[in-house]
Amino acid sequence: MQSFIFFVFLIYGFFPHCQSINDGNIKINLPNQQDVIYRYTRSERGDPAEKEGSVFKLRTTVFFVVYGLLVLLAFIAFLVWRLRRSKTQEKRKNMALMNIYSDLRDTGDAMPEELKNRPLNDKLDYLPYKKQYEIASENLENKSILGSGNFGVVRKGILKMASPKNEEEKKMRLTVAVKSAANCYDISQTSMLAAELRLMCSIGRFPNVLALVGAVTSELRKGRLLIVTEYIDCGDIRKYLIDHRNVFQDHLIEDKTEPDSYLTPISAKRKNYVFKNTDENSDYVIKESLDSLTTSDLLSFGLQIANGMQYLASIPMVHRDLALRNVLLKKNKTIRIADFGMARTHENKSYYIPQKTKDAPVPVRWMSPEAFDTMKFTEKSDVWSFGICLYEIFTLGQLPYPDVPSERIYEYMHSGRRCPQPQHCHVELYDLMKLCWHEKPELRPNFSNCVEYFIGHMKKSASKLLENVDEMLRVEAENQRKLEDWIRVERSESV
């Protein structure tokens, strides 16, 4: 009531000289108090429909205003949450990268005695990063992508010499392969890459093993870790064999000097090497042209893989995924065993996911039975895989067990069945394959035995080829030694 009286006096004060207001058929004289009261009462008793409409509009307006404010507040709250979450994740990421960087730079804790004779794979946490492999980022230029997978990207790179001694060396450039994480924000990928780097540092350099040139670790705290290796220009051997099947020259033919007998089955007739080159000095010699493919090349590939695996086993180190797709080929037909890192793409159709591993694809066509059973890998399981590699070589890249589905490989192996003798394979080498595929691991040869077997076989049948391979590997060892000159900060004048 007091508010109403105040309202009346307010109007009276604002309109002291007004005479009348014409509101429809009602004439109201102001500032007569009675008239003002009458108008107020008339307004309150107005049309109910109009009053209801006004109330509805008011409620609608209030609803949308309140709803809008709530949405705005919710959006602001969401932004604040995202910002805090992002900062928390960024902080955790930076701490994780710092830990990886510190672990990589740390000389490492003393290795437990029980691990000292174990393969490198079992003691990754204790393997140091050797600082002499560090490459200044300004000396490395990344180029086109060579390949990529779920965990890593490999690019072609150009490396400048760290300490050139003259103008000629300043102009020199080395083509390299540069591996990085597929997603630099994924800590697990960076961690696996760091583990692979420590592994490669400990492996060292050997002619038939992909050599580490160096690494860029200075920007690891920003999520950037680069592994720099030799650039191998011709891809993997399996693809090369498949692509050159139509030009293959088979020098392994049936031996006509052996007496024919109806008691000797056709499948048992022996084949020997007959090299058809007319130039005596060119017999057994590997042609560096990639356009040619002969039996000599197949023998050379087999020996070189055995040679590289013998070196890895001597470290010791277990490969776990030895297959021709992981053996690279240079233009001069020397090979490099590669892909012994922790990160695997598993995009190859020859991989199969067994029930035991649930979601971890494994190369069942190359795996030994005991590795399939226990998921534990040893030199002897690698030897089994080497036998499969020989099968791939002498079938010119054919898939092992081509008629057996991946999910039935385990059953097939345990039944005692094995891959048949390839058409282009000497019987002595097939005997080696069967030894590699012995059901009992302890009865399989080791890689030193495999190298000796190969050398003995080639001495009898292709001695000049053996000399040729030895010379190629000597040159490759020297080329790998020179890789140090590209990253060494201080070089003597005699270098």
UniProtKB/Swiss-Prot annotation:
Q: Please give, as recorded in its UniProt entry, the membrane topology of this protein.
A: Single-pass membrane protein
In terms of superkingdom, the source organism counts as Eukaryota
So where's the catalytic machinery, residue-wise?
321 (proton acceptor)
Please indicate the ranges of residues that lie on the Cytoplasmic side. 82-495
Read off the Pfam families from this record: PK_Tyr_Ser-Thr
What's its job?
May be specifically involved in cell-cell interactions regulating cell fusions that generate the hypodermis during postembryonic development. It has a role in the development of the HYP7 hypodermal syncytium.
- Protein name per Swiss-Prot or TrEMBL: Receptor-like tyrosine-protein kinase kin-16
> Which gene is this protein's source?
kin-16
